[in-house]
UniProtKB/Swiss-Prot annotation:
Pfam family, one: MULE
Sample GO molecular function, one term: zinc ion binding
Residues in MULE domain copies: 292-388
Protein name: Putative protein FAR1-RELATED SEQUENCE 10
One biological process term in Gene Ontology: regulation of DNA-templated transcription
Ranges of residues in domain FAR1: 69-161
Length: 685
């Protein structure tokens, strides 16, 4: 059996982060996964016949293949299989007779026994069954058709039930998607029996219910072994040549675009290991919205043996923007460290405030080493998607009960409460020695809600943003059938996003006012349509909350139906500072419904300026680096000036006194700049 190439060189990463190289996770969202209903359906090619009656002499078919499909479908439902026997042809008509017979028709001819001490005796399934269907070709007025000339449905053996007939060789098929998965697992060192068990687990079927048996998998792997070896040698050579082509493309792009940056590493044999690149628009976007970064490592290339890492940011309209790409030779801490170092260097030394990733111990260590002052957050959705692969087989029927306990665990109010509940949970389900449970516990500070609530993540943990990243990546990898196209596809996506960003405010209309509150109208004139819609939703929900002012100053806010816990809000009218125990503003940069409710109760008609973050405003701080003739300044002066103005604006907006002082000093500074003679012009007008 020949090795079939993969449909796409980029596939979802399935290696489990637990450290066991033989452990894989099931991808529940993988579209190629065959559902249980598909497994239970007929594994032969889809038949056009919904209802099949017993064939009869004189029945007419357009082609002999159509007749074979009809008879095969009839046999499948009747409890046997068929095979093609004799065919007869002539010079004028070609093949004019076809004989289809029961799989147990005829008798095996005696074979010469091998010259071995204990020859293997194999009992033949053929028993002289008379089940058959003979076809004859007839041509009438130049049109040929086939009719049944003989038919017998008399069998001298027992017909099989449906759960047995599916195991006949004629109906045992390994589909293309399963072939690819089997080869991946075999290459990773999985024995055949474990491959079968893993496929049963992934497809959610009971043991023995796959459309093929262990013997078929063993034969398939054996047949493909030589092809796999040849394919590995070919792909090694192809990876080297494609990598060099990618570097040449990067070099050419850097010559055409001075803002494009790239870098690579080589091994001791001077062969390229890792490659990274970023576009000028990405670097400029990071200077505005580089506070939160998502590092996605969902895709890897099996043929190339490379991991694709993509850095994303989120702009003031809630859109994902590509910041940079890396191709890594492996998933080690060393490779991730180089990726992070290179990314920070591309972004001119600026570290993000928060970085969000999948759960991975190597990546966790690299972030702790290279970004010690950056908050590391693991997507909860990524953890939840792995729970079934980690624990469903171990816990069996108790898995759903475990999931309920885990969900309750995530609602722990503090770390001490989590520690107590965690010990009870793992002890109750016997998971104390489990490596996946140990992985979760070791990374708890990065995914536990009560631990990450104070980390600023903008709106990157929303389902809408995650869907936009998935869609972005799918567009890139679907069109990237080689490394060079990966560079081109990512460039197209960055260019399209940058073009859209220039028009996004005129294109997006603001939601109409819903509460008629002065605060709502005030925010509408400051925030982008996206940020305003998020804040507006909190305003609408705030009217459902009751407020009780305590004697010592704080406010207790709770839902009128007490559907959730109470929140403590502290309001300082002198400094116009407000804080809520839910930490929503610290988490997303948008005031929560609890604080908005307190502001309303205290007759505040405007939201304090410091609670309109620069990143969510209509006009983000941006100093143009191009003159009217389109000529870029091109040095680090503009970037330095940009950073200074951004810092100045951030610090000035903290209080009214600071803002007044900054305005006064800036007016004097502008006058001085205007009166300074331009000794060295940065560009010619």
């Amino acid at each position: 059996m020949a090795l079939k190439p993969l449909n796409n060189i980029w596939i979802r990463r399935q290696q489990c982060p637990c450290g066991d190289w033989k452990c894989y996770i099931r991808l529940e969202e993988d579209e190629s996964t065959i559902t249980k209903s598909e497994i239970e359906s007929t594994p032969t090619p889809t038949s056009q016949y919904d209802t099949v009656f017993t064939p009869y002499v004189g029945q007419i078919f357009t082609t002999d293949d159509e007749a074979f499909e009809y008879y095969s479908t009839f046999a499948r439902k009747s409890g046997f299989s068929i095979r093609k026997a004799r065919s007869t042809e002539s010079q004028n008509l070609g093949v004019y007779r076809r004989d289809f017979v029961c799989y147990r028709s005829g008798f095996n001819q005696p074979r010469k026994k091998a010259n071995v001490e204990h020859p293997r005796e194999r009992k033949s399934v053929r028993c002289g069954c008379d089940g058959k269907l003979y076809l004859t070709k007839e041509v009438v007025d130049g049109v040929s058709h086939w009719y049944v000339s003989q038919f017998s449905n008399v069998h001298n053996h027992e017909l099989l039930e449906d759960d047995q007939v599916r195991l006949l060789p004629a109906y045992r098929k390994i589909q293309q998607s399963d072939q690819e998965r089997i080869l991946l697992l075999s290459k990773a060192g999985f024995p055949v029996n474990r491959i079968v068990k893993l496929l049963e687990l992934e497809k959610g079927v009971v043991s023995g219910q796959l459309p093929f048996i262990e013997k078929d998998v063993r034969n398939f792997v054996r047949a493909c072994k030589k092809s796999v070896q040849e394919n590995d040698a070919f792909m090694t050579e192809k990876r080297e040549s494609d990598t060099l082509e990618l570097l040449e493309c990067c070099k050419g792009l850097a010559e055409r675009d001075m803002d494009f940056v790239y870098d690579c590493t080589s091994d001791e044999n001077q062969k390229v290991e890792n490659i990274a690149w970023a576009y000028g628009d990405s670097v400029r976007g990071y200077s505005l919205f580089g506070d939160v970064v998502v590092f996605d490592t969902s895709y890897r290339s099996v043929p190339y043996g490379l991991l694709l890492g993509v850095f994303f940011g989120i702009d003031n309209n809630g859109k994902a923007m590509l910041l940079g790409c890396v191709l890594l030779q492996d998933e080690s801490c060393r490779s991730f460290t180089w990726a992070l170092q290179t990314f920070v260097r591309f972004m001119r030394g600026r570290h993000p405030q928060t970085i969000l990733t999948d759960i991975d111990t190597g990546l966790k260590d690299a972030i702790g080493r290279e970004m010690p002052n950056t908050n590391h957050v693991v997507f909860m959705s990524h953890i939840v998607s792995k729970l079934a692969s980690w624990f469903s087989q171990t816990l069996g029927s108790h898995y759903e009960e475990f999931r309920a306990g885990f969900d309750m665990l995530c609602r722990a109010g503090n770390v001490d409460e989590f520690e107590q509940q965690w010990d009870l949970l793992v002890t109750r389900f016997g998971l104390v020695p489990d490596r996946h449970a140990a992985l979760l516990y070791s990374c708890r500070a990065s995914w536990l809600p009560c631990c990450i609530r104070e980390h600023f993540v903008a709106q990157t943990m929303t389902s809408e943003f995650n869907l936009s990243i998935d869609s972005f990546l799918k567009r890139v990898v679907d069109g990237a059938t080689c490394m060079q196209l990966l560079l081109e596809e990512s460039a197209l996506q960055v260019s399209a996003a940058a073009s859209l960003a220039k028009q996004i405010l005129p294109r997006f209309t603001y939601p109409s006012l819903k509460t008629c509150m002065p605060m709502e109208d005030h925010a509408r004139g400051i925030l982008t349509p996206y940020a305003f819609s998020v804040l507006q939703n909190e305003m609408v929900l705030s009217v459902q909350y009751a407020v009780a002012e305590m004697a010592n100053g704080p406010f207790i806010v709770h839902h009128y139906k007490k559907m959730e816990g109470e929140c403590c809000v502290i309001w300082n009218p002198e400094n116009e500072e407000i804080q809520c125990s839910c930490k929503e503003f610290e988490h997303s940069g948008i005031l929560c419904r609890h604080t908005l409710r307190v502001l309303t109760v205290k007759n505040c008609f405007h939201i304090p300026e410091q609670y309109f973050l620069l990143r969510w405003r209509q006009e983000s701080p941006h100093v143009a680096t191009e003159n009217q003739n389109g000529q870029g300044i091109g040095d680090d002066s503009a970037q330095t000036f940009h950073s200074l103005t951004e810092t100045l604006l951030t610090e000035s907006m903290i209080s009214k006194d600071r803002l007044d002082y900054a305005n006064q000093e800036l007016s004097l500074l502008i006058d001085r700049v205007r009166n300074t003679a331009p000794a060295n012009c940065l560009y010619q007008p």
